[in-house]
């Protein structure tokens, strides 16, 4: 990237890196650290035409969320304005956008893919 003076870096964080979560201090801290590091690197590499951004998913339909008890899942879903879990495709489409030339003037940002659960 440095040699070509062009690049796109997209890191995956989590809604928990912005909100915290009971029993997940270590996870929340590591996801928040990715965001802070990405902002610093975005400043450092902007003049080299390298953009660095984050995608921060909320609750996404996956093997992990499939294990959540339905009553708990209903409570979580009720806290999402779009009233549903996201999909892996929602996340991958966001990564594809940030990796494209359409996002050439976006750097140091975090795009939240969470159905409106967190608007920060």
Regions found by a protein language model. Give the residues of each.
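Hydrophobic structural elements of the Rossmann-like NAD(P)H-binding subdomain
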Residues: 10, 52-55, 65, 108, ...
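A glycine/serine/threonine-rich, flexible loop-to-helix segment
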Residues: 47, 59-80, 120
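Residue(s) in the substrate-gating loop at a strand-loop-helix junction
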Residues: 14
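C-terminal helical subdomain
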Residues: 54, 76-102, 106, 115
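Alpha-helical segment proximal to the catalytic Tyr-Lys
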Residues: 43-47, 104
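Active-site helix of classical SDR
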Residues: 30, 38
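Short C-terminal tail/terminal secondary-structure segment
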Residues: 19-22, 96, 107-120
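Short, flexible catalytic-loop segment of classical short-chain dehydrogenase/reductase
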Residues: 18, 35, 53-67
């Amino acid at each position: 990237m440095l040699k070509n003076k062009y690049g796109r870096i997209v890191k995956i964080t989590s809604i928990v890196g912005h909100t915290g979560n009971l029993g997940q201090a270590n996870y929340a801290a590591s996801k928040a650290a990715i965001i802070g590091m990405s902002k610093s690197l975005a400043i450092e590499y902007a003049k080299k035409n390298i953009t660095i951004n984050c995608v921060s998913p909320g609750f996404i339909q996956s093997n992990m969320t499939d294990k959540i008890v339905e009553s708990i899942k209903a409570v979580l879903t009720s806290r999402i304005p779009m009233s549903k879990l996201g999909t892996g495709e929602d996340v991958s489409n966001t990564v594809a956008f940030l990796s494209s030339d359409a996002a050439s003037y976006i750097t140091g940002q975090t795009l939240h893919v969470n159905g409106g659960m967190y608007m920060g």
